[in-house]
Curated annotation (Swiss-Prot):
Subcellular compartments: Lysosome membrane; Late endosome membrane
Gene that specifies this protein: RMC1
Entry annotated with the keyword Membrane: yes
GO CC aspect terms: late endosome membrane; lysosomal membrane; Mon1-Ccz1 complex
Protein's name in the database: Regulator of MON1-CCZ1 complex
Amino acid sequence: MGEEDYYLELCERPVQFEKANPVNCVFFDEANKQVFAVRSGGATGVVVKGPDDRNPISFRMDDKGEVKCIKFSLENKILAVQRTSKTVDFCNFIPDNSQLEYTQECKTKNANILGFCWTSSTEIVFITDQGIEFYQVLPEKRSLKLLKSHNLNVNWYMYCPESAVILLSTTVLENVLQPFHFRAGTMSKLPKFEIELPAAPKSTKPSLSERDIAMATIYGQLYVLFLRHHSRTSNSTGAEVVLYHLPREGACKKMHILKLNRTGKFALNVVDNLVVVHHQDTETSVIFDIKLRGEFDGSVTFHHPVLPARSIQPYQIPITGPAAVTSQSPVPCKLYSSSWIVFQPDIIISASQGYLWNLQVKLEPIVNLLPDKGRLMDFLLQRKECKMVILSVCSQMLSESDRASLPVIATVFDKLNHEYKKYLDAEQSYAMAVEAGQSRSSPLLKRPVRTQAVLDQSDVYTHVLSAFVEKKEMPHKFVIAVLMEYIRSLNQFQIAVQHYLHELVIKTLVQHNLFYMLHQFLQYHVLSDSKPLACLLLSLESFYPPAHQLSLDMLKRLSTANDEIVEVLLSKHQVLAALRFIRGIGGHDNISARKFLDAAKQTEDNMLFYTIFRFFEQRNQRLRGSPNFTPGEHCEEHVAFFKQIFGDQALMRPTTF
C-alpha cells in the first residue's frame, strides 16, 4: 500500500518517557495530558512530561508505599498523590509556599477512594465507591475545604476534562450513568441515564464495562460513546458504537449508531470531530463523521464508515541517544499492539515502548478514496486544516485528466459558497450588533471565527480559476461554463460578485472572439455593473467597437459623474479611452491638457504621447488660432519632452487663412 493510501498517522514528535518496568510505574493524567514516570515510589525520582513541555518536571518524593494515582492540578501548581484507599496526599509546587506534604481523608465512613480529578488549579473531586466529594484546596493553609458531596454507590468513573463532566457508573448492571458537571466552585448533578445493554444468554449476567465507554466532545457537543459488542437486534451481525448526546440542560438522548460490521477487540479515539474505531484483530481503523448524512429511523441515525478500513501509517521509531549510530536504521513500531492504551480524544500510549502519540487525520489520501465529490466536500469542509486540500480538489476536477461534469462542479461551488455565505452573514450580524452597542451589554457577543472552510472569491480566483483559464488544452466553452457556474452560485447565495471574476469572463470571451456572447451577458445583466468592468469594456473598443457604448451605458446606470469616469480611466492608463469618452459627451474643449499628457507620459508609450499631444495642439488651434499651449496650462515640461523625442520640426505650425 502506497503512502498516499493511509489516512491516519501517529504524530512525528511523540512524548518519550521511561518504559514501564517492575521499578518504574507509568501514569497518565488526561486533564493535563501528562505522563508520570514514578521510580521506586518516587524515592529515586518522578519525571513528568506533557505534549507541549519543552522542559520536563523532575522531582523526588519519599517512598510512602505504592502510588495508585498521581496528578498535577491545572497549571502544575499542586501535586496530588493517592497511595491508600482512604487518603490523598498533597504537595505545593508554588514558589514561597511550604513544600511539606498535607493529607486529606475521604469524608464518607468505610468508603474507598477509586480515584480523583482536578477540575481547576485549586479544585479537586474525590470519587469513592460510595459517592463523590468536591473540595477546594487551600495551598497556603495546607488544607482542604469540602464544597459539596453526593452519596451513591459507584462501580467506576470517567472524566472528560474538556467539558469538566464526571460520569459515575451505578447499579448492579453498572449501566445507569450519573453525570456531574463542575464549574468555578460549583457541582451540578445532571439527569442520569441508562445504557441499553445487548441481549445476553441466560447463564451470563450482562454488565457495562468501563472499557466499552468513552466521553468526547464532537462538533462542540458532549457525547458518551458506548461500544456495544453485539447489536440489540439479533438479525444484525457485528459490533456498533452508540452515541448518547449529553446536553448541559435536559436529558441524555441516544442520537447515533456507528455500524462496525465486525467483531473483536476495539478502541476509540476522536480526531478532528471524527470518531476513529481501531480494530486489533485486522490491525485497521475506520472513521465516522456524524455530520455526514446517515440513515434516520425516526429516533437515531445510522452511520457507516466514511472510507474503507486502513491501517495507521507505518511508523518508524527514531533512534536517539548515545546508541544512535548512522548505520542503524529506525525500528518499525508495532502498530495496534496489545500494550497500547488509548485516551480521549486523540491519544495513544505504548507504556512498554515509552511513547505517547497524538493520532492525526491526513486529508490528501481521502481525496482519492472518496469518489463522490459532493460527499467529499461535505467531509472536507468540516475538517480543521481543509483549505489547501479543497482548493486542490477544485483544481483537480477542472483538470483535463480528471474533469468533472458541470452538475458536479456546480454542487462543489454551491457547497463552498454555502459556508462562505454563513460566515458573511455572521460577520454582518456581529458588525450590526457592535454598531447598536450590544457588545457592552452582552459579553457573550463574539466575533465569528473564520475557519479554513471559508473560501472566498479571491481564494478561488487565485488558486483555481486564474490558472484554469490559462490552460490551452481546455475547450473554451467549458472554461466559460465553469466561470459562469461559479458566478451563478455566488448570485444564488446573494454574495456580491467581485469585479475581477467578471473581468476574467470578459477576457476569456474576447480571447476566443465570442463577442456575441459578451453582448448577451451584458444585455441580460448576467455580468453585474461595476466601474472596473466599465473601464475594461472601454479598453476593448479597438477589438470590439460596440464595447464603447456598452461601457458608457453601464457607467450611466451606475450614475457615475463624468469627471470621475475620466479619473478612473486615466488611473487605469486607458488614456485614449478617456479621451474618446470625453469627446463622446462633448466635454473635450474644457479638459486639462496637462492631466492627459501626464497620464500619457506615465505609460512610457511614445506614440501614445504623440497622439495625445497632437490632439491638444489641434484643440488649441481650433479654439485660439494657435497650436501653442498658454503658460496657464503648465505644459512646458511636456513640450520639452515632445521636442526631445520627436524634434522641433514635429511641432505643429500655426495655420493662417
